[in-house]
């Protein structure tokens, strides 16, 4: 179910403070965050945010098309190694 419009988008305050500080100082370094649940706001466009996927921080460059989505959508947590090959097909 979608979030109610009257509540507005959710963004962790510590992430918002980091983005504002980076904007004011014109800093281009990636902002490291564990907040996968935060919604991408128009203020984030053009910034690189390193989102934690459970193991490492994955750098995500935010574009206009990403506004309204969650940060966790762009940092995959699972790696698919492929199904086991059929032994009969190898012969």
Swiss-Prot record:
Pfam families xref list: Ribosomal_S19 (PF00203)
Gene Ontology cellular component list: cytoplasm; small ribosomal subunit
Repressor listed as a keyword: no
Top-level division of the source organism's lineage: Bacteria
Sorted UniProt keywords: Ribonucleoprotein, Ribosomal protein, RNA-binding, rRNA-binding
Entry's Gene Ontology BP terms: ribosomal small subunit assembly; translation
Database matches in PROSITE patterns: RIBOSOMAL_S19
Single annotated GO MF: structural constituent of ribosome
Described function: Protein S19 forms a complex with S13 that binds strongly to the 16S ribosomal RNA.
Classification via HAMAP family: Ribosomal_uS19
Family indicated by similarity: Belongs to the universal ribosomal protein uS19 family.
Protein name stated in the entry: Small ribosomal subunit protein uS19
Organism lineage: Bacteria, Pseudomonadati, Pseudomonadota, Betaproteobacteria, Neisseriales
């Amino acid at each position: 179910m979608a979030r109610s419009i009257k509540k507005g988008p959710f963004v962790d305050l510590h992430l918002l403070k980091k983005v504002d500080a980076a904007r004011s100082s014109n800093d281009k370094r990636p902002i490291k965050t564990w907040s996968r649940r935060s919604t991408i706001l128009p203020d984030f466009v053009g910034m690189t945010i390193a989102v934690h996927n459970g193991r490492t921080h994955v750098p995500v460059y935010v574009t206009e098309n990403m506004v309204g989505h969650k940060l966790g959508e762009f940092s995959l947590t699972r790696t698919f190694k492929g199904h086991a090959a059929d032994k009969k097909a190898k012969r």
